[in-house]
Swiss-Prot record:
Compartment(s) where it occurs, according to its Swiss-Prot or TrEMBL record: Cytoplasm; Endosome
Record's compositionally biased regions (Basic and acidic residues): 854-865
GO molecular function: deubiquitinase activator activity
Organism: Candida glabrata (strain ATCC 2001 / BCRC 20586 / JCM 3761 / NBRC 0622 / NRRL Y-65 / CBS 138)
Source superkingdom: Eukaryota
Protein keywords: Coiled coil, Cytoplasm, Endosome, Protein transport, Transport
Family according to the record: Belongs to the BRO1 family.
The protein's name: Vacuolar protein-sorting protein BRO1
Keyword field contains Cytoplasm: yes
Amino acid composition bias (Pro residues), ranges on this chain: 756-765
Main location: cytoplasm
GO BP terms: ATP export; intralumenal vesicle formation; mitochondria-associated ubiquitin-dependent protein catabolic process; positive regulation of protein deubiquitination; protein deubiquitination; protein localization to endosome; protein transport to vacuole involved in ubiquitin-dependent protein catabolic process via the multivesicular body sorting pathway
Residue ranges of domain BRO1 in the record: 4-400
Amino acid sequence: MKPSVIGLKCKDTDKVDWKRGLSSYLKRIYGSRQWKEFYDEQLCVEMDHVRNNANGELGAVTLVEQNYKYYAYLEQLYLRLGNNIGQFKLEFTWYDAEYGLVSSPTKHTQKTLVFEKSCTLYNLGVALTEVANEKINEDFKTAMVHMAKAMECFRYLSENFFNSPSADLQTENTKFLSDLSHAEAQEMFLINAINNGTSEKQASLISKLAYSGSNLYENCWEFLRTEEGGLTPYGEARWNSIVSGKHHFFRSLAAYYNALALEQNNKYGEAIAFLKLATQCLSSSLPYKYALNDNFDFDGFGETIKDKTKQLIKDNDYIFHDSIPQSVSLSSIKALDAIKAPKWEEQLKPFMEAIAHKCEKLYRGIVPMEVFEKESIYSEKKASMLRQCINDSETADMEYSSFIEFTHLPNLLSDLKRRYKSQNFSGTTDPQGDMMRDQIQSWIKSISQSKYKDPDEQLKLISSKKQEILTLLAGLPSEQKENVVKLKMALVEAAASDEKLFSLVQPYAAQLRLLKQPDELWKIFNMFSIDESNKQSLLDIDDSKNQEILAKISDIEQMAEDLRLLKEERGRTLKELKSQTNDDDITNTLLVNSKAESEELEVIFKKELDKFKPLTTRIEATIFKQESVVNEVKNELDNVFSLSGLENKTSEEEEKQKKRKEFFMQIEEAATKFLIFNNDLPKGLEFYDSLLKMSKDLAVSVKVQNNASGSDNNSNNGYVSGNVIPPSLPPQPRNVGSSIDSQFQSMNLGSVPTPQRFPQPPAPNSRPIVSMENYTSQFSVPPAHGDLPPAYNQVPLVPTRNYDQPHGSGNYPGNVSSQHPVSSSPIPGAYDQVPMVPPKQPPAEGRSQISRQEQMEREERELQRDPTAFYKKSSVFDESLYSRYSGK
């Protein structure tokens, strides 16, 4: 016997131009200027080529590979676009497979990517069955694997693609093709077991396999069977005969081999009954013999059953006398399905991975928003991990630098090594004391050079700045209440920061005072020095331990070198970690897992972050090793000092050493806190300077606005008393100080906004703070009144500065040659002429005289309060200046 496979036919298709579709999509999305940044013509051509190959006249094995590859391209695109492929404006045309007597296949055209995927998957299943049919006689295992894959393709198609217009893709038809492929794969396994020469020994196994195969073919027969004269639901009419014949033949095989198994178990009566059942099933398959005669030997198998039945009946009659059941059923046999098809996702995975890098380039302009959101979550987790590594690394580097700086380790080791090598002990025998002296001297120098060495003085300076700010704010009108509140809130926050900052140094006022008075400090420090006058000369001390001391110094030098190498290694590893995190991209992973829930996403993120574990572990290892080496260095230094004989001290000397160490630690703590204070205080002072400047600007702006209001009144009075109206200029902003918010947004306690060199134009509908530096060119427009002439309510021309005109030419200050009209509206009469300076006439009424006198007194008071106000106010529209300095 040999297995047979029903031949399936592929679907035909029309050509699709992916190159045109992708380019037109990118042009619509990114515009004609940028679309080429996301377009790769070579990869588009390659995708078109793969589709043509997948539907070409190639060998079955090549067709399988090309269809897998093309489906992977489609799946990658589907992960990005979903069902929005209509934006590509492509049409996919496919024809139904040509089964039976159909003269012309049905044509179906759709614009959905799902239709293209389902048709490709159908052709892939067909190609897999062709490969299985080719490999049946050459390689049974390969054939069975390909048939199992085809079964899974059709199963996936039936469960995931619905409502297709094509008959080939309808759910019931693809379900039938899946069952058919399953049955044929089971058939291959069964016949291979029968043909291996040990079928009788495996009779029980073969009976289970045969019964399972008969059940699978029965499912196919149930789908294909029709009433007499009816049409086959799908495929060709001969398929019904093939499926029915195999169904009955495999039932016969199952009964026969079950009888052999019963005979081996000494159940001769049941064995005879199953042999009779095998004969009946074989008889049922004979009508379909013509369809399977090339593969199955019906006559030979019938003779085998007949001979075996005669033998068992004879043995039972003469020897065993076992009762024969009247009827038996195949249901007593436990069916065994030998086919385990790989999941579709597992089949596609290697091809998805193979083209992933190409699709990242090909589809880089097509990324859904959901993926961007998930990428941002992952990026934050990655950034958090990187920040932690950076902080740990910087802390370790700081600890290393502090240890080297505070111990002066290189100089200390060099000095000790030189002394013990040359046996020159004429200097001090107290290296710890030398180290302390050097360190204290460096602190004294740092504090003496600091501009902020007196915290009390700095506190007074801050208090004076705060008082000045509060004084300025107190003088502001109620209209500026909102800005005043904001500035005062900033002062409160700054005060809290000041309290924390000054609390660092206040507990160490005594130590800082000593550091600013070196003579007094050294006097105290020398009180703890050891009196060497009564000690034995070091020249008389046994120097037999010199070599041991030098060896320990060499060990310490090696440890110091190890510390340096650890720091460099940590820096290199951190740099590599930054590079890898920057280059890391999980877009493709998120696309593949686009339907993952939040819990699944957390697992994916954790797995992706594990990629950086080797680098983060190396950084942690260098930090741990550094701490260990630092402790070893400290211990070895103590051993060196002990071997030097410095440990043989009296109780009084030990007490002095202890007190000196305590004193040094106090000075060290004070110096450390002062360094922090010295670094942070300038930021606070700059912050107060910024608040003060903002307060001054606010006060000056309010003052200037008040002056501008006075100018408005003067202009109105000039119109009433005279016949000439001064030209109106663009309106001045009224709500002063509303840009305080923007200034606060760009300023905090750690940084002060840099003042702009040039004034910026105000934003629409905003009312910025007015600076006195550029206020000389800003004036207020007199309000329009209904009782004024109509021409006054129109926008007048800005006067042209014509120095050739005799009237009023000497009364206009400035060097501007001309000005252009601010409006094109015609203004009749006197408004077309250059406005004249109001004539200097004495007031006709006492009321005008009193008003002018009050105005002059008010301006005199303003000049006394602000002597520079005179230079900040233009004289063009202040007619009082002419009378004030005219001697009248």
